Amino acid sequence: MASRVSDTGNGNENKENEGTVASDHSEARCSYILFEAECSDGGDDEESMEDSLVEDLVDDASVHQGNSLSLFHAQTVEEYEGEIQSLKRKFILSPLHRDVAELSPRLAGVSLEENRGKKARKSLFHDDSGIDSSAVEVSQLSSTPSAPGPDIRLPKPSDIDLEPLFQSRQRCTHMYSKFKAVYGVSFTDITRPFKSDKTTSQHWVVAAYYLAFDSEISAMEVLLRQQCQFLYIDNNDGIILFFLEYNVQKSRTTVYNWFTANFHYNENRMLANPPRTRNMPAALFFYHRFMGTGGIKHGAMPEIIVNQCVVSNQQTDTFELSRMVQWALDNDLQDEHMLALEYALLAESDGNARAFLKQNNQPMIVKNCSIMVRHYKTALVAKMSISQYVNKRCLDHGEADENSWRGIVHFLRYQGQEFLPFMCKMHNFLHHRPKKSTLVLCGPSDTGKSYFANGLNKFLDGHVLSFVSNGSHFWLSPLRGARCCLIDDATLTFWRYADQNMRALLDGYEISIDAKHRNPMQTRAPPLIITTNEDIMRLDEFKYLQTRTMYVYFNKPFPLKGNGQPLYYIDGYTWNSFFRKFWRHLNLKDPEDESDGETPGTIRLYTRADTDTI
């Protein structure tokens, strides 16, 4: 390799010499290596670079990436929708649905078909994914031109954020606090908590959270009008408040199912309880909402609200025992449990009943009312003659069929009894003739003795004696105040007991009856109806009872139809027709001749006054 000649004093000469040396030795050597680059002050290099045809290998310009995430999202959605389109041919709305939407969005919200929404699915992207609103929008291809339609339920950021909250254990706390923040009153202060979802009520207060659109509320109004006497709907800050007075009573489960079936609501986002019926602040809250201009109202205001807000109703809510006793007498109620229940149910329309429910000593009031009713009824019945009493019992059974009495006559003939002797025994029985006031129905089993006797005793509102309680000193206490009495299925043991201890009772004379916690009371023995399988007329040991009883024999089996029903139907209405038909034959007098212008068996304890609503 040739040595390089270097001269620092003259740069140009060195350059020329180097080129000469290189050219001279190019043929003899394989390559020429330049170890250093020489600096030069000239501009020849720049000019040569401008004339070069080699492009830059590195681009240092700023590069804009673009919204690739939005594009990927759009492509993913388009691919997914394409797969769904191939599987479900009804995915795209038909032109008919679009025409209905163009005519009226409200009309499109009302449909008789089941609204089948898309099932929830897991998605990689949500609407609040952080993509800026100014990102590139990818238009969705459609075979038909777009048209305005009804509100479509799309997942909203508020729905996505609140869904875990409504699924948590604290959802009720959040819902109660949200309701109080919006309406200024707690939901529990205006409603009664029902622990069971099966308990029914006619009035319901429903609060729905973040569920409905305006078109759905209009559809609700149309559908609820068919089921409710009164409805109120108010949409305020994401909470829809319903006050519903249904035509019939419904349970919480039924209310939830209706909203779920028609509008696909989630039960976790709803509260439902009946309103408070005896709470003035709650009534004023609803009254203020109903009288306002906001919300949707339909129908007359419920009575449970009017009764608490009207002045006249508040002024008359003072309890009077006499009014309760009068009501019990008019409705023929004297059992304590029935008195308490029926009078409590009357609270919606009667001020005295509402005042009764506000009392703290309701058991004592019910007991006193039952005692007073029993005293009044006993005294009224004791004052009546037998004609007045039978007429009252006929009136209590209402209008009778004119020909139903024939069933009694045909049954007696079927058993071989002559009608005239039976009428004589009935005459003595009703008029309480001494030694002729005990009617005995005797015969084998299954001959209709008890059926016949119970029908007559029930019509006369008689009492029942059970010999099974003869070990007690008070087993004869039902005889007090009774117009007749029934002893069913008497055996030889009873007849021996009656022969020793009850001869005066069978005679129909005055007897002394021992009652619990009372002194023995003297009263006249009522007429008796006795059914038995023992014919004491053929036994000499009962000769003292044979003159005190009137026997009627039933020897044939009781006739039945093919379906098991009695051939001769005998009940209270049949006896009503019987006594009306043979009134004169039984020597019963006209009630108007004995009453002296007064209706027997009635009493007026207080003067009823009409109150006008202010």
From Swiss-Prot:
Q: What positions does the entry give for ATP binding?
A: 443-450
Any one GO CC term of this protein is: host cell nucleus
For this chain, the Swiss-Prot or TrEMBL PTM comment says:
Phosphorylated.
Top EC class per UniProt? Answer: isomerase
| Cellular localization per UniProt | Host nucleus
> Sorted alphabetically, which InterPro entries does this protein's record hold?
Helicase_SF3_DNA-vir, P-loop_NTPase, PPV_DNA_helicase_E1_C, PPV_DNA_helicase_E1_N, PPV_E1_DBD, PPV_E1_DBD_sf, Rep_E1_papillomaV, Znf_lg_T-Ag_D1_dom_sf
Q: Could you give a GO molecular-function term held by this entry?
A: ATP hydrolysis activity
Give the sites modified to Phosphoserine. 94, 104
Q: What stretch of residues is annotated with the motif Nuclear localization signal?
A: 88-90
Catalytic reaction(s) noted: Couples ATP hydrolysis with the unwinding of duplex DNA by translocating in the 3'-5' direction; ATP + H2O = ADP + phosphate + H(+)
Ranges of Basic and acidic residues composition bias in the record? 13-25
Residues in the signal sequence = none
**Family annotation (SUPFAM superfamilies):** Origin of replication-binding domain, RBD-like, P-loop containing nucleoside triphosphate hydrolases
Q: Record's Pfam families?
A: PPV_E1_C, PPV_E1_DBD, PPV_E1_N
Q: Where is the composition biased (Polar residues)?
A: 136-146
| Residue numbers covered by motif Nuclear export signal | 103-112
Q: Which UniProt keywords apply?
A: ATP-binding, DNA replication, DNA-binding, Early protein, Helicase, Host nucleus, Hydrolase, Isomerase, Nucleotide-binding, Phosphoprotein
Question: Where do the segments described as Disordered lie?
Answer: 1-25, 136-156
Instruction: Give the start-end ranges of region DNA-binding region.
Output: 154-316
Q: How does it assemble?
A: Can form hexamers. Interacts with E2 protein; this interaction increases E1 DNA binding specificity. Interacts with host DNA polymerase subunit POLA2. Interacts with host single stranded DNA-binding protein RPA1. Interacts with host TOP1; this interaction stimulates the enzymatic activity of TOP1.
Family the entry assigns: Belongs to the papillomaviridae E1 protein family.
- Known role: ATP-dependent DNA 3'-5' helicase required for initiation of viral DNA replication. It forms a complex with the viral E2 protein. The E1-E2 complex binds to the replication origin which contains binding sites for both proteins. During the initial step, a dimer of E1 interacts with a dimer of protein E2 leading to a complex that binds the viral origin of replication with high specificity. Then, a second dimer of E1 displaces the E2 dimer in an ATP-dependent manner to form the E1 tetramer.
Q: Name the chain's protein.
A: Replication protein E1
Q: Which organism is it from?
A: Human papillomavirus type 41
